[in-house]
């Protein structure tokens, strides 16, 4: 299964991808983590952009994702978290899929109220010490999401791929909603 997760910062994309990855036995490919893991000398400018709440350049992300998707564990499917984030990335990814005779199965849109998101991001910033979760950057990240990523929903709705998920509940309830949406029966996360 090939699934893209779209949602604002703090919606739980990474958490839900991890849970679903174990169940489906496909890799969770999170571009945010991949970008944060770049060596400082090779990714200094990228880190500065991310620390300011901005996206990495499209061409850089497209190359990074293409390299990751070429690995053997991605052949049967994958869960994309943080990609695509822009119309340029989505259009280029569509072309890559067509060239490989592949298609996306779903785009899961994790929806959460602004109040819930702000609280989640504040807590995550305290526990994970992520510069991009500091209160100073939260609103800027929301603005960027609304301007550049949210419009991708229309792109994928036209393809009939978007499934809206209420992600304001607990981790386990959101996971159950995703499984129901995918018509997929799973053991609870505690059992896996």
UniProtKB/Swiss-Prot annotation:
GO MF terms, alphabetically ordered: adenylate kinase activity; ATP binding; nucleoside diphosphate kinase activity
Xref: Gene3D superfamilies: P-loop containing nucleotide triphosphate hydrolases
Pathway recorded for this protein: Purine metabolism; AMP biosynthesis via salvage pathway; AMP from ADP: step 1/1
Binding site for ATP: 10-15, 124, 169
Chain positions covered by the region annotation NMP: 30-56
Reaction equations catalysed: AMP + ATP = 2 ADP
One GO cellular component term: cytosol
Subcellular location: Cytoplasm
Free-text function comment from the UniProt entry: Catalyzes the reversible transfer of the terminal phosphate group between ATP and AMP. Plays an important role in cellular energy homeostasis and in adenine nucleotide metabolism.
Name used for this protein in its record: Adenylate kinase
Organism of provenance: Rhodopirellula baltica (strain DSM 10527 / NCIMB 13988 / SH1)
Name of the gene encoding the protein in the UniProt record: adk
């Amino acid at each position: 299964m090939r699934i893209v997760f779209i949602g604002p910062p703090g919606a739980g994309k990474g958490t839900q991808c991890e849970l679903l990855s174990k169940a489906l036995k496909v890799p969770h490919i999170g571009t945010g983590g991949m970008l944060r893991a770049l060596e400082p000398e090779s990714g200094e400018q990228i880190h500065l952009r991310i620390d300011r709440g901005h996206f990495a350049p499209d061409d850089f992300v497209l190359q990074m994702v293409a390299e990751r998707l070429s690995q053997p564990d991605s052949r049967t499917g994958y869960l994309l978290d943080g990609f695509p984030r822009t119309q340029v990335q989505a259009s280029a990814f569509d072309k890559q899929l067509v060239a490989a005779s592949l298609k996306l199965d779903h785009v899961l849109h994790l929806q959460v109220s602004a109040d819930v998101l702000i609280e989640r991001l504040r807590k995550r910033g305290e526990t994970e010490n992520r510069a991009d979760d500091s209160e100073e950057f939260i609103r800027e990240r929301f603005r960027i999401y609304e301007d550049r990523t949210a419009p991708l929903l229309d792109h994928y709705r036209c393809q009939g791929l978007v499934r809206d998920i209420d992600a304001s509940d607990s981790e386990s309830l959101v996971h159950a909603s995703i499984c129901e949406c995918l018509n997929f029966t799973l053991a609870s996360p505690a059992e896996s």
